[in-house]
């Protein structure tokens, strides 16, 4: 790289050209070797934070001499020439050009520094430490920071791999548990369905039992009603029989009349016809049958069987024969 020619400071102050000083400020030493990089260039770059800090340092270094030179030139111009009105547009243009040039120079210097860091070997670094110790220390610090960042990245990757393995193991265990839970859920659902079916069957049985109980109750009520009607009919029939008087047959009255006509002759007990339960007051009155006929000529004598005439005749003949035999004796 060729050195720029030194010009007269008075001419530079008259032209107000500031870029010449800025270029001189970024001049690198001649003994610095900027050859091609060797192996491990990426190891010397460092992290993004290191690069940013390096860029800020270079920008401060580049802006310091330029600002100092600019202020000296302004002071010299103010003292040498009388004050004159300034054109604002021209000054703004000059300022914008200065900042643009400063940014370009800073970018170029950063690129040169990166190339220098890539190309640095231990021998060159030792030579640089002898020439510029601060820069060598900064390069060493960047290398150490890069090594630490690599170590952190390696530890982080190892930790991530360990976590991935742990998560895979947990996922396998959880999948097995999920399979068991699904199997249990299937069994429980089948058992639940069976219990529902049994519950429906029990409900149907309960409904049938209720219907059967209702039918039995209805049948019982019907039987009670039927039994009550029969009991009422029997009671009415028995009460009717109690009110109906017993009709004395005709043949005991005839026999009694015959006995009175024969003078009170009595037959032995074996020849006497059987007598029903006849009241004594009816037997004592010979005209009882006629009184009964007069009291109820139709109703109560309808049950008498008048066709039993031979029995009456037989009893009379037996009584007559008995009276004849008694008279013969």
Swiss-Prot record:
Q: Where is the bZIP domain?
A: 132-195
> InterPro entries under this entry?
bZIP (IPR004827), bZIP_RF2 (IPR044759), bZIP_sf (IPR046347)
The molecular function GO annotations come to: DNA binding; DNA-binding transcription factor activity
Residue ranges for the region (Disordered) are 1-24, 62-97, 260-303
Q: Does the keyword Transcription apply?
A: yes
**Location of region: Leucine-zipper:** 160-174
By its UniProt entry, which SUPFAM superfamilies does this protein fall under? Leucine zipper domain (SSF57959)
Record-linked Pfam families: bZIP_1 (PF00170)
**Where is the protein found, in the record's own terms?**
Nucleus
Q: Name one GO cellular component term.
A: nucleus
Return the annotated region ranges for Basic motif.
134-155
Gene3D superfamilies with a match to the protein in the record: 1.20.5.170
What does UniProt note about where in the body, tissue by tissue, this protein is expressed?
Expressed at high levels in roots, low level in leaf sheath, but not in leaf blade. Predominantly expressed in vascular tissues.
Keywords noted in UniProt: Activator, DNA-binding, Nucleus, Transcription, Transcription regulation
Give the family, as the similarity comment puts it: Belongs to the bZIP family.
Q: How does it assemble?
A: Binds DNA as a homodimer or as a heterodimer with RF2a. The heterodimer binds stronger to DNA than the homodimer.
Functional note:
Transcription factor probably involved in vascular development and shoot tissue organization. Binds to the DNA sequence 5'-CCGAGTGTGCCCCTGG-3' present in the promoter region Box II of the phloem-specific rice tungro bacilliform virus (RTBV) promoter. May regulate tissue-specific expression of the RTBV promoter and virus replication.
The name this protein carries in UniProt is: Transcription factor RF2b
The encoding gene: RF2b
